């Protein structure tokens, strides 16, 4: 996959959100890592993550979309599948 591909951008930003916004040790995060059992996210972390994804990636996921993601890879795919918002702010 090319370095500048959208998938790599989403992956890098998601790892940044996990590290910076949710204080996750990303050295153990893989696409197969389960968000709750392996990464340790709880309901508060999901809410913070939802806001961070919107702010940093311009993608709005519904609560249902976010909660349907079991793994980091599922979350990456859900983000990549959503259209990015353009902001005039």
Swiss-Prot record:
- Briefly state the modifications made to the protein after translation: 4'-phosphopantetheine is transferred from CoA to a specific serine of apo-ACP, leading to the activated holo-ACP form.
- One matching Pfam family is PP-binding
Q: Which UniProt keywords apply?
A: Cytoplasm, Phosphopantetheine, Phosphoprotein
Where is it located?
A: Cytoplasm
Residues bearing the modification O-(pantetheine 4'-phosphoryl)serine? 43
The UniProt entry, under InterPro entries, shows: ACP-like_sf (IPR036736), PP-bd_ACP (IPR009081)
- What protein name does the entry list? Acyl carrier protein MbtL
Q: Which organism is it from?
A: Mycolicibacterium paratuberculosis (strain ATCC BAA-968 / K-10) (Mycobacterium paratuberculosis)
Gene that encodes it: mbtL
């Amino acid at each position: 996959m090319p370095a500048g591909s959208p998938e790599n951008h989403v992956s890098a930003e998601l790892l940044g959100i996990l590290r910076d916004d949710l204080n996750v040790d990303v050295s153990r995060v893989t696409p197969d890592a389960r968000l709750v059992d392996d990464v340790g996210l709880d309901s508060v972390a999901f809410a913070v993550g939802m806001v961070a994804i919107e702010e940093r990636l311009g993608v709005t996921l519904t609560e249902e979309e976010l909660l349907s993601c079991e793994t980091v890879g599922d979350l990456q795919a859900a983000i990549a599948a959503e259209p990015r918002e353009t902001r005039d702010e």
